[in-house]
A protein has these predicted regions:
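Proline/Glycine/Serine-rich low-complexity intrinsically disordered segments
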Residues: 1-172
Length: 172
């Protein structure tokens, strides 16, 4: 399974080298009050949510000043429904999820503050993605790492774009 490589998860499974770093972004309604936000400071006071047990909910939402943080949603589709139905002003998620959401929900707008001083503060551990394997399965881990080493950043970006295009959120 592909997931963030955290110290806690490393206690249970082994991971390949990271193959993707997931930018953290916000989704708002294109005609909503936060559509022109240029950084997280512009999101102050927003009603927001995200998916449970994610860096988006646990680390990013608390960085929005005076945010009204709703209970965490059980899934990405649930958080998108919360935004689309007007229950919240914004959700925080990763770039692939947001890109697919904008295909499925054309009235949503993706806000990417990456590379600015006013972005969400996260560690590499919170955004790096690797393939988890059963602890101690070094044969599989070595083969996966060998395969990953043959791919370029452009290869990973192309595969991510292809995956976004065919995932259920994109099949509107």
């Amino acid at each position: 399974a592909g997931q963030s490589i955290t110290a806690k998860r490393l206690e249970q499974v082994d991971f390949t080298t990271p193959y993707y770093y997931a930018s953290i972004v916000s989704l708002v309604m294109a005609d909503g009050p936060y559509a022109d936000a240029a950084g997280i400071s512009d999101l102050a006071g927003a009603t927001c949510t995200s998916q449970q047990t994610t860096v988006w909910y646990d680390t990013c939402l608390p960085q929005i000043e005076n945010a009204n943080i709703l209970p965490a949603m059980e899934s990405a589709p649930a958080m998108l429904v919360a935004l689309d139905s007007g229950r919240c002003d914004l959700v925080v998620t990763d770039m692939p999820t947001a890109m697919a959401a904008c295909v499925a929900y054309p009235d949503m707008k993706l806000l990417d503050f990456s590379g600015t001083e006013d972005d969400f503060a996260v560690s590499d551990e919170e955004i790096n993605i690797g393939i988890s394997v059963q602890k101690g399965n070094t044969a599989l881990l070595d083969r996966l790492n060998e395969a990953l080493a043959t791919l370029t950043t452009d290869d990973f970006a192309r595969m991510m774009d292809e995956a976004i295009a065919v995932q259920p959120l994109s099949e509107g």
